[in-house]
Regions:
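Short beta-strand-loop/turn "lid" adjacent to the catalytic site in phosphate-handling enzymes
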Residues: 2-44, 56-57
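Active-site metal-binding loops of divalent metal-dependent hydrolases
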Residues: 17, 74, 208-210
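Short acidic-aromatic active-site loops that bind/stabilize oxyanions
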Residues: 45-48, 168-184
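Conserved phosphate-binding catalytic cores of ATP/NTP-utilizing and phosphoryl-transfer enzymes
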Residues: 47-70
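Active-site pocket-lining segments that scaffold enzyme catalytic pockets across diverse folds
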Residues: 58-59, 66, 188-192, 210, ...
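A short helix-loop
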Residues: 68-172, 218-219
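Phosphate/ATP-binding catalytic cores across multiple sugar-kinase/actin-like superfamilies
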Residues: 176-201
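Glycine-rich phosphate-binding loops at beta-strand->alpha-helix junctions
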Residues: 203-217
């Protein structure tokens, strides 16, 4: 339909840069690999950054022409959080977090510890968080302390595996505590973006995998 309606595309962009991504995999001790995207057409392919793809999607499909854009996910190539100023046709990146510091990786590691599949079943943990009215304080404090003092959540389950030796930390207590820590960090981020000197309108577009955490989006 698109080809019939608009004709042949002038450019085709891929949503991330696999070569930059490979450098991060080398850094993390993972085996780098690259498989070119397969297209049925002979178009010249251009790569863009993962977070720029998120930001562009959020802004250019929105009703705003002057706004801040916040992107948070587990990880792009290296970036895990980016903040952008969008005005007119332009997107300008203001600041970022880079791997291994990642709010999304923290949530995924805790999802795995609680017994669900990381990078897929975080929505189940988000729902399970509602079972308790308040987080179990020792677990909440342990997660928050880890976030404040050690950003190596890329180690995944091994990050929190030692908790199994501690009787005060049970997997069933993790969802509510993890959600509470996530929301605390998220509120701080939103406050910083809202108060940024370039936020002229008060608008914020939030995109990326963490935007699916609808419980936190009420802020």
């Amino acid at each position: 339909y698109v080809l019939e309606e608009y004709g042949e595309p002038a450019k085709v962009y891929f949503y991330e840069n696999p070569f930059v991504k490979m450098s991060r995999r080398w850094y993390a001790g993972q085996k780098p690999f690259y498989k070119p995207p397969e297209f049925p057409y002979n178009y010249k392919l251009k790569y863009t950054s993962h977070h720029l793809s998120h930001a562009a999607y959020g802004y250019y499909t929105s009703p705003f022409d002057n706004t801040m854009v916040l992107v948070i996910d587990a990880i792009g190539e290296w970036e895990t959080l980016t903040v952008w100023k969008a005005k007119g046709k332009k997107l300008k990146k203001l600041w970022n977090w880079k791997y291994p510091k990642s709010l999304g990786l923290m949530y995924s590691a805790l999802t795995q510890y609680a017994g669900w599949k990381p990078n897929e079943e975080e929505y189940i943990m988000m729902g399970a968080a509602a079972r308790q009215t308040y987080p179990y304080e020792p677990v909440y404090n342990r997660i928050l302390n880890l976030w404040n003092n050690d950003t190596s959540w890329h180690r995944g389950l091994s990050k929190v595996e030692a908790w199994k030796e501690r009787p005060e930390v049970h997997p069933e207590d993790v969802p509510t505590a993890a959600q509470a820590v996530y929301e605390k960090i998220f509120r701080d981020i939103i406050k910083e973006v809202s108060n940024h000197k370039l936020n002229e309108t008060g608008n914020i577009i939030f995109v990326g995998g963490c935007a699916l955490n609808v419980s936190a989006n009420r802020f």
